[in-house]
A protein has these predicted regions:
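Short glycine-rich anion-binding loops that position phosphate/pyrophosphate groups of nucleotides
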Residues: 1-3, 28, 68-71, 180-182
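Active-site diphosphate/adenylate-binding microenvironment
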Residues: 8-11, 138-214
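Electropositive phosphate-/nucleotide-binding environments in soluble metabolic enzymes
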Residues: 5-8, 47-50, 104-111, 115, ...
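Glycine-rich, acidic loop regions that bind phosphate or pyrophosphate groups
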Residues: 28-135
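Short, solvent-exposed amphipathic alpha-helical segments in soluble enzyme
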Residues: 8-19, 78-83, 104-105, 189-194
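Short, basic, glycine/proline-bearing loop/turn elements
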Residues: 1, 32-45, 59-63, 143-151, ...
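Catalytic alpha/large subunits of respiratory electron-transfer oxidoreductases
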Residues: 1-25, 62, 171-174
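Short hydrophobic/aromatic-enriched beta-strand-loop microsegments
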Residues: 20-22, 43, 88, 108, ...
Length: 215
């Protein structure tokens, strides 16, 4: 998957040369590093199609799916209109269905494929119209966590709790998340800047998994 250290490094090398917008899945949390966040990160997507990242996927001229696993977020959710142009970069052929039909597939060593692509796209600049759209969308990402929080007396808003947790962690710490409604809040709003340092159980969504992971 895209979250391996080698693949993450190659993705970051591309993003340092070409400011392409990136959307992470929950399992892909941490691929975008802290220094690349401002220019390239547009949030995470999964479960429900209502995030800024979903807006980006719908508007994209081309979706490059790197190590994408449909069990995380099925294409019928993010490509309901069946309008997305898709290229897959993975170690095995894509699971093609009505909603996921790649135009091209680069199958093999993902790190090597990305390294070979870098010289071909180096120097590419997004069209001016796309840049303006992304500026507006980035504001949506930022404002999404700034709305007025007024929890009932004696309760805590989930985002307030996440902010406290964020203050207690650094980029080297690994955070394990159990299954429940808090899982959605953490997946969308908890920031992680290293791959496989924010862990979720997708697919079967194993209850209680956070404890043995932590052990």
């Amino acid at each position: 998957g895209a979250s391996s250290e080698a693949v993450t490094y190659s993705i970051r090398q591309i993003l340092k040369h070409v400011k392409l917008p990136v959307v992470e899945t929950f399992q892909g949390a941490g691929i975008v590093s802290r220094d690349l966040e401002e220019d390239t990160f547009f949030g995470r997507v999964g479960l429900f199609r209502n995030q800024p990242g979903d807006m980006l996927l719908k508007k994209s001229d081309l979706v490059i799916a790197i190590g994408y696993d449909p069990i995380e977020y099925e294409a019928r959710n993010w490509n309901a209109e069946i309008s997305a142009r898709i290229i897959v970069i993975d170690v095995e052929p894509a699971e093609v269905d009505t909603y996921f039909q790649p135009e091209r597939e680069l199958i093999g060593n993902v790190e090597a494929s990305l390294n070979l692509l870098l010289p071909a796209i180096q120097g590419y600049k997004l069209p001016e119209g796309s840049v303006e759209y992304l500026k507006g969308l980035k504001n949506n990402v930022v404002e999404d966590v700034k709305f007025d929080r007024q929890p009932d007396e004696g309760t805590v808003h989930p985002l307030d709790l996440i902010e406290v947790l964020q203050e207690q962690t650094d980029d080297d710490m690994t955070v394990t998340v159990d299954v429940g409604s808090h899982y959605i809040w953490m997946a969308r709003y908890f920031k992680s800047y290293e791959p496989r340092h924010l862990l979720f159980s997708n697919g079967m969504q194993t209850l209680g998994v956070a404890l043995p992971w932590a052990i």
